[in-house]
């Protein structure tokens, strides 16, 4: 938690209080409550249709919640957006064609209540090298970087990014996150939604996992991984007996490729002891914690299974 000079906690940059957004009878966001503190880098993770984009749209005052309350810097999000306190990079919306990158950034900067010098924005967004190219002639990755330039062209305190590295190649993604580190170092708060879980693992100091519009997990990358409660066991085994392996205690998942066995287990000791007690002699044994992707899948799968069971009981 961020602290002020007096040691008292700083007020949250963003707060959602039991927010719901319903389309017809279908909740896209269902009782979402969360807070973002100053200086945090927060990843927003969830499968397609989880409610990430709807939540970001409501945060940016593009949609109104059906019920609940959203606050940005202590007031309605509309006022913070109008004052230029937030910059955003969304998936939807095109860029003006037949103008250069420099011309577009200059135009948007001119409307910003708290503008940065255009040259500073071009450099920080990593678009200076193609600033004189036309926007409609850029690659997908370059276009994304221009969107980023528009998001940071002012002295915004909060930056909101929805799938920012889509269409970027590996090198462009690396350069993008280097740019983001500069923004965070300058004291900005960052909230980003992504499908690249390795980015969340490396860049975020906090991760929010949502599914069906509900918050399932909130913690550091390490805490989210531990939340899954399983470990991966990998080893080589002569004469693999799949029926035996499928009956192992604490088994969560099994993959066999030739003589290589990979197991997800909720109790790695019990699983390994059962293999050895049965007379098998596994080689090259490795026991590791699940990666963020496996933890994310386990958390959302558990939620899906629980909801499916509840739905079945009510039918």
Protein language model annotation of sequence segments:
Residues 106, 110, 116-131:
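Conserved ABC ATPase "signature" region
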Residues 60:
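Helix-to-loop junction immediately C-terminal to a conserved catalytic motif
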């Amino acid at each position: 938690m961020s602290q002020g000079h007096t040691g008292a906690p700083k007020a949250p940059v963003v707060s959602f209080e039991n927010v719901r957004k319903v389309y017809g009878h279908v909740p896209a966001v269902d009782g979402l409550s969360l807070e973002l503190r100053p200086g945090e880098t927060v990843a927003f993770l969830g499968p397609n249709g989880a409610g990430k984009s709807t939540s970001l749209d409501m945060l940016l005052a593009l949609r109104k919640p059906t019920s609940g309350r959203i606050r940005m810097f202590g007031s309605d999000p509309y006022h913070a957006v109008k004052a230029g306190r937030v910059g955003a990079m969304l998936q939807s919306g095109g860029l003006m064609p037949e103008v250069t990158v420099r011309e577009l950034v200059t135009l948007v900067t001119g409307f910003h209540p708290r503008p940065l010098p255009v040259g500073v924005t071009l450099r920080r967004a990593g678009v200076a090298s193609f600033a004189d190219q036309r926007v409609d002639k850029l690659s997908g990755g370059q276009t994304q970087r221009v969107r980023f330039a528009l998001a940071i062209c002012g002295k915004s305190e909060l930056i909101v990014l929805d799938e920012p590295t889509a269409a970027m190649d590996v090198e462009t993604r690396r350069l993008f996150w280097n740019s983001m580190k500069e923004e965070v170092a300058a004291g900005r708060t960052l909230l980003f939604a992504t499908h690249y879980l390795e980015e969340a693992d490396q860049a975020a100091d906090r991760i929010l996992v949502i599914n069906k519009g509900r918050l399932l997990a909130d913690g550091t990358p390490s805490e989210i991984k531990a939340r899954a409660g399983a470990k991966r066991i990998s080893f080589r085994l002569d004469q693999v007996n799949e029926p035996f392996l499928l009956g192992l205690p604490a088994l969560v998942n099994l993959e066999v490729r030739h003589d290589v066995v990979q197991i997800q287990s909720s109790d790695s000791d019990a699983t390994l002891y059962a293999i050895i007690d049965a007379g098998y002699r596994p080689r090259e044994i490795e026991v590791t914690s699940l990666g963020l992707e496996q933890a994310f899948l386990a958390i959302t799968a558990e939620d899906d299974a629980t909801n499916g069971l509840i739905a079945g009981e009510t039918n």
